Amino acid sequence: MKKLFRATALCGACLWAMGSSPALAQTLPEQHDLKILTYNIRHGQGLDGRTDYVRIGSILKKSGADVVAVQEVDSVTNRSGGQDVLRRVADEALMYPAFARSMSFDGGAYGVGLLAKEKPLSVKRVPLPGAEEPRVLLVAEFRDYCVACTHLSLTPADQWASVPILKQVAAAYDKPFFLAGDWNAQPTDSTLKLIQRDFKLLNNTKKLTFPADEPDQTIDYVALWRPTARRVVARGSRVISEEKASDHRPVEVTVRFLQPNENVFYAPPYLQNPGNGGVTVMCQTRVIAHTWVEYGTDTLHLQRAQTLVGGQAACHDIEHKIRLNGLQDGQTYYYRVCAREIADYQSYSKTFGDTVRSRFYRFKLPAADQTDFKVMVMNDLHLVSRDEEAMARIAREEKPDFICFNGDCLPEPSTREEAMYNINRLAKRFDGAQVPLFFIRGNHEIRNAYSAGMPSLFDYPGGHSYGAFSWGDTRFVILDCGEDKPDDHWVYYGLNDFRGFREEQLAFLQQEFKEKAFRRASRRVLLCHIPLWGNEDKYNPCQDMWGGALQRAPFDVELSAHTHRFVYHPAGTIGNPFPVCVGGGPGAATYMLLQKQGKKLHLTVKNLQGEVLRQVDL
């Protein structure tokens, strides 16, 4: 790939493909935590006698709260020097302000406010009963939730009369509704008991909030409307130890929103590493989850498998790799993947979402003495969507037993999100939930920021990007050729050591040739991205290092890629001890069908127009 015209064509193809693909824009939704704070600021005057709006805003900014309910707020009063107090605080806290007047006061207004990092979709003011002074409820609606702020009357009768209004307002929304503020009632008062029938208190009422210097009571709260509480998990609360800025202490609550059930799975599962009486089911979730697989020879009598690490269920990440062992060769199995979002994982408590289940899929492992199979091999797709779609249509027609992507099909992953998107796109297109997939690493999979992380999204035979597996009585050996330039090339910045990696594979090859599975196989196939013979680059370290061992190896064929130009080299024509078939690339894409029937092994190479480029009995 050193020729200028070829490099230019490749870059153009890759840029076209990536520009037209949503892969680069694909991001995972983070688990959605919301921090709500309520604070009666006493119009900004602290117990030290200072009226300091910047101090209040600084406290809120430092807390990291997403939404703040603020009580006792002046607006352009004489007492505030004509200042818009909430806006002054909001500017310091870097939040959007919303003010609700409860009454006119001192040349301006007095009431409650809400501050938020996110601009509300709408804001609503609702009057509440108040004998000693007018009271008000301020509601801000956001995309996923609502937050309401109030400062209830000092009079119990007014408090009780306010509760039906609070309930009516909350019931008008079909999303989580939080109520926060200074309610002028203690936890044992009848007002709190009445409110708690329909609202769930989220802060620890044993943590005292008033007065700020020496608190002896709790009158500040954050609560959640119970009918909308099902998909909200309380993750903790605290009272901030601020003794001077106001006569109340700020109360902070953190909650987490569970993902909708339909969003828990990132994509359907995909099968990896079939063999030795087992197969690996891989999937990713959009949130931290506990996953397991239910499987059996029918859909009614199911076993359960999960991944354990030192006796613990592996549920600390969004990547899931579950091995199904003890399977009977030649038997059809059905399986589904199950997951529960973990909303809160503490030492002595855990909170889960609903159990979500995929649909049932099926697969069958080959018997050890099985002679017949069909495998489809493609290479150098380079994210070209039209080629992927065409190959997927062909795969649906050909119905191969398994599929090999022979390198540069998942090039240059920059992030885990991008790698996941591209892998799952191919897996979905090629029915990877029911057809085992082998992803062979090409030189372009080695490049970019997440290249060293992407292997965790696969389960390779033997645990390496090289290895061997048997399909019936045929042995397949996979080699990872590494990069196509020397390790000391400037573009690698001293981060590569593929010479050592190739030496490791030489030792693997020497051991593989001694293995019973290799020696007793009726046929043997070598898969590698860069051709060991027929590589058009002058730099060919794999042939230099492995060629001697492979000269004596009884392979029936080598299937390779990399050059983007289809060519077939019969054994002995270029020093190759066995036939070498090299697949085409973007603009001249090809696919290979390797089919075995009885003792006969047949290779067919076609382009995407369906033209047969080569047919050969091996």
For each feature predicted by the language model, list its residue ranges.
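Structured beta-strand-rich core segments of catalytic domains in phosphoester-bond hydrolases
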Residues: 33, 48-49, 72-146, 235-241, ...
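Acidic, histidine-bearing metal-coordination/catalytic regions of metal-dependent phosphoesterases
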Residues: 3-8, 12-15, 23-37, 228, ...
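Active-site environment of divalent metal-dependent phosphoester hydrolases
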Residues: 44-46, 75-79, 105-107, 155-160, ...
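Metal-dependent phosphoester-hydrolase catalytic domains
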Residues: 26, 125-126, 156-158, 168-178, ...
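N-terminal, active-site-proximal structural segment of metallo-dependent hydrolase catalytic domains
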Residues: 23-91, 104-108, 164, 243, ...
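Active-site beta-strand/loop signature of hydrolases that rely on acidic residues for catalysis
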Residues: 34-41, 56-81, 147-150, 166-194, ...
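His/acidic metal-ligating clusters that form di-metal
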Residues: 139-148, 159-198, 289-291, 398-402, ...
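Extended active-site neighborhood of metal-dependent phosphoesterases/phosphodiesterases
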Residues: 88-91, 110-116, 121-124, 337-362, ...
